UniProtKB/Swiss-Prot annotation:
Keywords: ATP-binding, Cytoplasm, Magnesium, Metal-binding, Nucleotide-binding, One-carbon metabolism, Potassium, Transferase. This is S-adenosylmethionine synthase. It comes from Mycolicibacterium gilvum (strain PYR-GCK) (Mycobacterium gilvum (strain PYR-GCK)). It is found in: Cytoplasm. Its EC number is 2.5.1.6.
Length: 402
């Protein structure tokens, strides 16, 4: 029997101020990609009481979408559910300030004509697109769940999605968009054995009693519903500690309660702290930015490695130099869970996956408006939407390569 340990991950709803910003940035990105798939986009958003500020750099031929950014912003805020001043924010009446310039020509030079082409004379078209920045990105997969994600973050996301669902479908019509969930799981070694604690904080209308209404209804319609659907083989969910709105009241929320920024929930977006993170955020960035596209590719790699049975869990790191197509480094960690030599796994990854930025964009078909749905509830292991980096299309190739 291994020593019991507790691990915690959190999620937030789409109405959290930081997630509003991620959603706005990705909605602008999608609108521009729909009009011009080759758009270069780096959009950051800030929200605060009554105001939205959208700034960054864009180079695009999608002139109509660019001119309509203000409406794109308002529509996404209203879709999230901030449609009245009673909720602390209103997409119809809030101020929207746009401050967007063009992408730096120095950066564009390195992306458009990579070092391999510019200096080395490479003829392969995939050698012509360089990485949009230097950096390191991680991907991870583990056999904790059917979606090959760590259980704590997977469960936290399910709770957040359910919280939004019962708000939007009217089951609990007094809920407001802002909310957070947190899950603590007890592990025996690497096996999740017991759900220890669930923390759920949700914005609500004024006058709602915590003990007599909010807590029992959240437990019934959100927590119990999610745990019933979970059906995990090793996890005991029979008696968790449940904390609903432990401050006692959560009426003031959204941008009125806290300012929000794009890219401030990078652990929520990825693996809930279970795996390492290279530091780069995703939302508002087109796929020429390896912060986003290479992190997606690493998840694709890791998920296929685990699905192929080469390891029960794997973390893969890739690194790039700005303006260069080929990665400068690849690192594979299997934490002793491998079924074949890790050196063979690393070699097989190099043979099966082309990790040049242009190849990633091609193989995952990333020049499409597919990003707005990823802005909340995680970019990986999604069970509610289909994402190209979640496909298991390289399993047989990996098995053959090792």
């Amino acid at each position: 029997m291994s020593e019991a340990r507790l691990f915690t991950s959190e999620s937030v709803t789409e109405g959290h101020p930081d997630k509003i910003c991620d959603a706005i940035s990705d909605s602008v990105l999608d609108a521009l990609l729909a009009g011009d798939p080759k758009s270069r986009v780096a959009v950051e958003t800030l929200v605060t009481t009554g105001q939205v500020h959208v700034v960054g750099e864009v180079t695009t031929n999608a002139k109509e979408a660019f001119a309509d950014i203000t409406n794109t912003v308002r529509e996404r805020i209203l879709e999230i559910g901030y449609d009245h001043s009673d909720k602390g924010f209103d997409g119809e009446t809030c101020g929207v300030n746009i401050g967007i310039g063009r992408q730096s020509p120095d950066i564009a030079q390195g992306v458009d004509t990579a070092h391999e082409t510019r200096v080395g004379g490479a003829a392969d078209p995939l050698d012509s697109q360089g990485a949009g920045d230097q950096g390191l990105m991680f991907g991870y997969a583990i056999a904790d769940t059917p979606e090959l994600m760590p259980l704590p973050i997977a469960l936290a996301h399910r709770l957040s999605r359910k919280l939004t669902e019962v708000r939007k479908n009217g089951t609990l019509d007094y809920l407001r968009p802002d909310g957070k969930t947190q899950v603590t799981v007890q592990y025996d070694g690497t096996t999740p054995v017991r759900l220890d604690t669930v923390v759920l904080s949700t914005q609500h209308a004024d006058g709602i009693e915590l003990d007599s209404q909010l807590e029992p209804e959240i437990k019934q319609h959100v927590i119990d519903a999610v745990l019933t659907e979970l059906g995990h083989q090793t996890l005991d969910t029979s008696n968790p500690r449940i904390l609903v709105n432990p401050t006692g009241k959560f009426v003031l929320g959204g941008p009125m309660g806290d300012a929000g920024l794009t890219g401030r929930k990078i652990i929520v977006d990825t693996y809930g702290g279970w795996a390492r993170h290279g530091g780069g955020a995703f939302s508002g960035k087109d796929p020429s930015k390896v912060d986003r596209s290479a992190a997606y590719a690493m998840r694709w790699v890791a998920k296929n490695v685990v699905a192929a049975g080469l390891a029960e869990r794997v973390e893969v790191q890739v690194a790039y130099a700005i303006g260069k197509a080929a990665p400068v480094g690849l690192f594979v960690e299997t934490f002793g869970s491998e079924t074949v030599d890790p050196v063979k796994i690393e070699k097989a990854i190099g043979e099966v996956f082309d990790l040049r930025p242009g190849a990633i964009v091609r193989d995952l078909d990333l020049l499409r408006p597919i990003y707005a749905p990823t802005a909340a509830y995680g970019h990986f292991g999604r069970t509610d939407i289909e994402l190209p980096w979640e496909q298991l299309n390289k399993v047989d190739d990996l098995k053959s390569a090792v």
